[in-house]
Structures are given as structure tokens and as C-alpha cells.
């Protein structure tokens, strides 16, 4: 049986909605939703929380996550990337935990509708198909890249982004293959 580690990240300093990860939705802090869902999963063995903010760490602990470290500030800036947060957590776990994990699932607090069924379905797909990684995606319901244009800054004219001419564009959107976009609610690897 594969051992699964859940990692829930939340940093301070949000510019769009200050303090968003601590904001209450139905009297529950946003950061608690993935912790609650992971706690109900059939497959997750341990939940760790990564943050640079002690108050968020305390909240995460109160909802059942372990908080073995405070995330270094260099991994909690506007320019920080998920990979650095993940590698920091994995390196810490590898160096400091006796138990070993086979799979990591990364759960974003900004997707509070992700529930234990979504998590278990993703992990079951991952196990069944022997995936190396898995990411959540969604079909674009409205904007197809075939209709994207770019602006020529010199002539101030638009031209198709993917095609040579506008006449090459399909008139019927139903004739286009569906396109999907990453919705990083969860990552598994």
C-alpha cells in the first residue's frame, strides 16, 4: 500500500485579498478546507501545512494538520513558485521524519470546493493508471485559443495568434476540439 502525504501551502502577504487564507467562509478559515477534506480521505496518511505565518500555522494545527516547520521567507514571496515550496517541504520531511511517503498530493486552500471525494478520485486514478503525476484541469467553456488575437504595437492592427489569416478561423465553435486549462486545485506526484 502506498503512503500518501498531503501538503497544504498558504503564505501571508496576499495582494489581491489581504489575509485571504484566514478569511472565514461559513465560519471556517479558507486554509482549513483542504485540511478537512484531506482528513476525510481514505488514502492520506499525513497532512502537513507549510506557511511563513505563525497564526495560519496555529489555525492549521487546530484543524488537524501537522506544522513541522515555518516556511522560509524566500519561499513565501510574490515571486515564489510552487516547486520551491514543495521541494522545501519534501526535503524537510525526508530529513526529519522516520516515516517515508510514496506519493505527495498538493492541495490549494484557494479551492475550498475540493472535497474528500475529489481527492480520493484523483488518487484512485493515479494508482489505477500508474501515473507519474496528475494535475486537475477543466475544459474551457467560453474562450478557445483559436480565437485569440495579438496586437501589433507598431501598426496597431490585430492578427490571429495561432493562425496566419482570419479567414482560416473556423466559424462554428462546435467544430473545434475542446481545450483544457490547468486548475491547480490539486497536484499528485
Which residues does each predicted region cover?
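N-terminal nucleotide-binding beta1-loop-alpha1 segment
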Residues: 1-18
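Residues in the short beta-alpha loop(s) of Rossmann-like NAD(P)-binding domains
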Residues: 28, 52-54
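Short internal beta-strands
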Residues: 32, 47-51, 136
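Short, high-confidence coil segments that cap the C-terminus of an alpha-helix
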Residues: 44, 99-101, 130-131
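Short phosphate-binding loop-to-helix
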Residues: 54-104, 113-114, 121
Amino acid at each position: 500500500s502506498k503512503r500518501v502525504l498531503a501538503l497544504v501551502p498558504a503564505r501571508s502577504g496576499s495582494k489581491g485579498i489581504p489575509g485571504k487564507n484566514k478569511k472565514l467562509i461559513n465560519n471556517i478559515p479558507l486554509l482549513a478546507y483542504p485540511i478537512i477534506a484531506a482528513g476525510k480521505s481514505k488514502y492520506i496518511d499525513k497532512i502537513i501545512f507549510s506557511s511563513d505565518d505563525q497564526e495560519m500555522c496555529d489555525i492549521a494545527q487546530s484543524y488537524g494538520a501537522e506544522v513541522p516547520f515555518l516556511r522560509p521567507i524566500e519561499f513565501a514571496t510574490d515571486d515564489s513558485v510552487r516547486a520551491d515550496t514543495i521541494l522545501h517541504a519534501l526535503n524537510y520531511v525526508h530529513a526529519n521524519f522516520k516515516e517515508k511517503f510514496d506519493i505527495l498530493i498538493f492541495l490549494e486552500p484557494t479551492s475550498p470546493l475540493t472535497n474528500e471525494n475529489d481527492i480520493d478520485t484523483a488518487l484512485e486514478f493515479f494508482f489505477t493508471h500508474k501515473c507519474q503525476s496528475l494535475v486537475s484541469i477543466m475544459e474551457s467553456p467560453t474562450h478557445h485559443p483559436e480565437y485569440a488575437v495579438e496586437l501589433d504595437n507598431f501598426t496597431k492592427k490585430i492578427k490571429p495568434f495561432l493562425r496566419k489569416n482570419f479567414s482560416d478561423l473556423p466559424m462554428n465553435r462546435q467544430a473545434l476540439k475542446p481545450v483544457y486549462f490547468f486548475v491547480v486545485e490539486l497536484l499528485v506526484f
